Amino acid sequence: MKCSTFCFWYVCKIIFFFLSFNIQISIANPQENFLKCFSQYIPTNVTNAKLVYTQHDQFYMSILNSTIQNLRFTSDTTPKPLVIITPLNVSHIQGTILCSKKVGLQIRTRSGGHDAEGMSYISQVPFVIVDLRNMHSVKIDVHSQTAWVEAGATLGEVYYWINENNENLSFPAGYCPTVGAGGHFSGGGYGALMRNYGLAADNIIDAHLVNVDGKVLDRKSMGEDLFWAIRGGGGENFGIIAAWKIRLVAVPSMSTIFSVKKNMEIHELVKLVNKWQNIAYMYEKELLLFTHFITRNITDNQGKNKTTIHSYFSSIFHGGVDSLVDLMNKSFPELGIKKTDCKQLSWIDTIIFYSGVVNYNTTYFKKEILLDRSGGRKAAFSIKLDYVKKPIPETAMVTILEKLYEEDVGVGMFVFYPYGGIMDEISESAIPFPHRAGIMYEIWYIASWEKQEDNEKHINWIRNVYNFTTPYVSQNPRMAYLNYRDLDLGKTNFESPNNYTQARIWGEKYFGKNFNRLVKVKTKVDPDNFFRNEQSIPPLPLRHH
């Protein structure tokens, strides 16, 4: 009996030693173990395609930085991935998930790299980036008016290929052509057609998602709850989106636009803004009228640097010049819109015009510019967003605009963007994005700058603006938009047992009453919280399952 007990103890000790040794080896060499695991997912017939980049690879930094759109996150101290995977197909995504789980690495998934807080390519723990640049096909079915869009496609590529197949079809998504479809669609995604057709996420009819077990799911196999969650609730919370099936929408053969600049004192400008905020959301959905204000540094007659504000009122109208001018003169005569202020453009040229890649006086638009994934000049930036449910008083509006003159602004911009139209008709719970009826407009606060040593100064400026506007925007909670992610709203401490309580603070700002349903979906499909970040949807603790 004694011998048996001793032998059992001795054998257990040996087993424990080898298990501990293997665990230590695994922990000590997560990159090596990941690569060994992942090698089985690399096809033997692919010789020229580069799928894997490690920190010793000569192209590692160029691949990493190529789609980092916010230069705040390119410093030497920014956490870097152990490995970057650029999958060619879904099997490589499956392999990355399974191997990352096996060796204890986190995953960040990057489509276009526009995450405002860099969370598609930054983690505070050892991690792998899945960079979807190679998965960017857009397959159009004109007959059914649908398309399959791989998650690595940019909005520019989506618009280009739809237009190539049919000039009277498009898709309701954002303005910036280098934004990736993977993240944009899964966070909501709004743009020029929002008041006509809703968000990008409102027009998704199927998806391919790779889940925590490495299985590829479509709408039928994932079920309606998970399909609901990934359309506005952040697909990265539940897996990796490989592709979306989207519903295409009708657009006019020609649209009419104007973008008029107003040079006037702020007190006079605010009178126009006040009129705008009371009528823009009430227009018929065929008219989008928005306004924005941007700082410009100029040199005055004495050679001194001076900050000035350029103010613009801009439109997209589904109709002709005469109809637009007549409508504006009746409803907003203070703007003084004339025929000479207007341009008639095809829909694809309208997209290019407002993409920011051409100037106002351009007379010829080459749509191939939408295929350029480089994004042009980049800068460091910070962005916040608010929803406005009642008119901001003129005195407060004066102070808000005057903040653009403050020393620490860098290049500052405020955009006032109207809601209304079909957005008033869609239920708050139709998808996780809850911002619908009752919202007059949203405000974007943006600061951009060149030097990384100025980061804190400019970030503090935008925080001060945000704090000032607190009494004038949505309340209880102060709502926010997932695609303009803001870590100032809160972060989850994964060591804390109160993940849900922490996440609820910011979760209800992004998702309102939909947050709890997202938590239930997360608990069901990823109970161990493998897909996580500082603002991910948490699963409920085991006792609450």
UniProtKB/Swiss-Prot annotation:
Enumerate the PANTHER family for this protein. OS08G0158400 PROTEIN
Disulfide linkages recorded for this protein, renumbered to the chain, are 37-99
Q: Where is this cross-link: 6-(S-cysteinyl)-8alpha-(pros-histidyl)-FAD (His-Cys)?
A: 114-176
- Signal sequence coordinates: 1-28
Which residues get glycosylated?
45, 65, 89, 168, 297, 305, 329, 361, 467, 499
Is this entry keyworded Flavoprotein?
A: yes
Q: Which GO terms describe its molecular function?
A: FAD binding; oxidoreductase activity
Family statement drawn from the similarity comment of this UniProt entry: Belongs to the oxygen-dependent FAD-linked oxidoreductase family.
UniProt-annotated location(s)? Secreted
Keyword terms of this UniProt record: Disulfide bond, FAD, Flavoprotein, Glycoprotein, Secreted, Signal
- This protein is called what? Cannabidiolic acid synthase-like 1
Textual note on the cofactor: Binds 1 FAD per subunit in a bicovalent manner.
Chief site of localization: secreted
